[in-house]
């Protein structure tokens, strides 16, 4: 599911909600990578889980998506802001458009922020309305990626069964929150002894997308789940469908909406991409030696209710004795969620709900 899940470990603060889009970060880094020196490009490859001399031939369909039907909506697109008159290489502009469909917009002052804010709001169907971008005097180039996802559950929750239930927060206090309930449905389910958590897979109407809920056995068990996110292999093992059993359960899941705005610079530096933010590394973007990346920022919003999931990000997821016993699974402690795109194997959204 991708090495970028490690970002969650870098950004994790006990007791604090978090939501990021690995797919959005992946798109931005792949775009930047085509303009980097070999050494910096190799470090980005390591971060993205691309090993050896192999570099995947980018497929435009992976990075520029406007996918609609009566079940799902997925939008992934980019825009590139270039200071008017600044010498950006034409090859980089062309490649960014050909692969990522990144539209190029010239700017002369900070008035461009209103235009970008409207573009983000329209692209995310109004889910993100206040994406402010401040183009300081030393900003020459900005690449903005938008990812929007909306999908209906294969098995929707009955709104009549939603009610207030206690949720135990990380600090041990209880809060009453709106909690959905579904029964008489079989979900892929397992108890993972390594991370001491229950794992449930919820399917959307379009089988391309799924959501995994990882519910620790204890209130602070989320720490152990986060600690396990050392690389993509670990998360792949945790959410491996082949290790799960299709089982009828009674599931209690909070309705929730999270909004997060994070600067990814320190996390990416700690993960080995420090050269990315140094001058002189972006030789494929401009001959100017002083050009560097100031920061990589992402704003994400996710909404989960009885009908399905709506999410967006902007970047600058037995029987015994003949009597059937149905497990009751309650997501009533801090838990992790992951929205996965089965087709690309890259998580769309990943986060932790803390109540």
UniProtKB/Swiss-Prot annotation:
SUPFAM superfamilies, alphabetized: Serpins (SSF56574)
Keyword set, alphabetical order: Protease inhibitor, Serine protease inhibitor
GO cellular component terms given for this protein: extracellular space
Keyword Zinc-finger attached: no
Keyword 4Fe-4S: no
Coiled-coil segments on the chain, per record: none
MF terms in GO: serine-type endopeptidase inhibitor activity
Gene3D superfamilies (alphabetical): Alpha-1-antitrypsin, domain 1, Antithrombin, subunit I, domain 2
The organism's place on the tree of life at top rank: Viruses
InterPro entries: Serpin_dom, Serpin_fam, Serpin_sf, Serpin_sf_1, Serpin_sf_2
Family, as annotated: Belongs to the serpin family. Poxviruses subfamily.
Protein name (record): Uncharacterized serpin-like protein FPV010
């Amino acid at each position: 599911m991708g090495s970028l899940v490690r970002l969650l470990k870098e950004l994790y603060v006990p007791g604090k909600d978090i939501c990021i889009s690995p797919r959005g970060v992946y798109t931005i880094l792949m775009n930047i990578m085509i303009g980097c020196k070999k050494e910096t490009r190799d470090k980005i490859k390591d971060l993205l889980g691309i090993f050896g001399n192999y570099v995947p031939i980018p497929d435009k369909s992976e990075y520029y998506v406007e996918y609609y039907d009566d079940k799902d909506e997925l939008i992934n697109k980019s825009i590139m802001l270039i200071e008017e008159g600044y010498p950006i290489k034409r090859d980089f502009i062309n490649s960014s458009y050909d692969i990522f469909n990144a539209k190029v917009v010239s700017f002369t002052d900070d008035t461009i922020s209103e235009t970008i804010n409207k573009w983000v709001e329209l692209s995310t169907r109004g889910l993100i309305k206040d994406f402010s971008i401040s183009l300081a005097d030393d900003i020459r180039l900005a690449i903005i990626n938008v990812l929007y996802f909306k999908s209906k559950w294969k098995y929707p929750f009955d709104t009549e069964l939603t009610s207030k239930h206690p949720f135990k927060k990380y600090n041990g206090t209880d809060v009453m929150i709106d909690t959905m309930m579904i029964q008489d449905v079989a979900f892929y389910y397992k108890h993972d002894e390594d991370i001491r958590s229950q794992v449930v897979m919820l399917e959307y109407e379009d089988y391309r997308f799924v959501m995994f809920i990882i519910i620790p056995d204890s209130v602070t068990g989320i720490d152990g789940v986060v600690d396990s996110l050392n690389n993509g292999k670990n998360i792949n093992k945790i959410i491996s469908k082949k290790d799960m059993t299709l089982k009828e359960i009674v599931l209690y899941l909070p309705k929730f909406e999270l909004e997060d705005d994070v600067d990814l610079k320190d996390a990416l530096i700690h993960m080995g991409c420090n050269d990315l933010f140094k001058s002189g590394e972006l030789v494929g973007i401009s001959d100017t030696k002083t050009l560097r990346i100031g920061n990589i920022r992402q704003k994400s919003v996710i909404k989960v209710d009885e009908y399905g999931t709506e999410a967006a990000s902007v970047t600058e997821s037995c029987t015994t004795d003949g009597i059937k016993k149905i497990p009751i699974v309650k997501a009533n402690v801090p838990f992790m969620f992951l929205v996965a795109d089965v087709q690309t194997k890259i998580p769309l959204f990943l986060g932790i709900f803390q109540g």
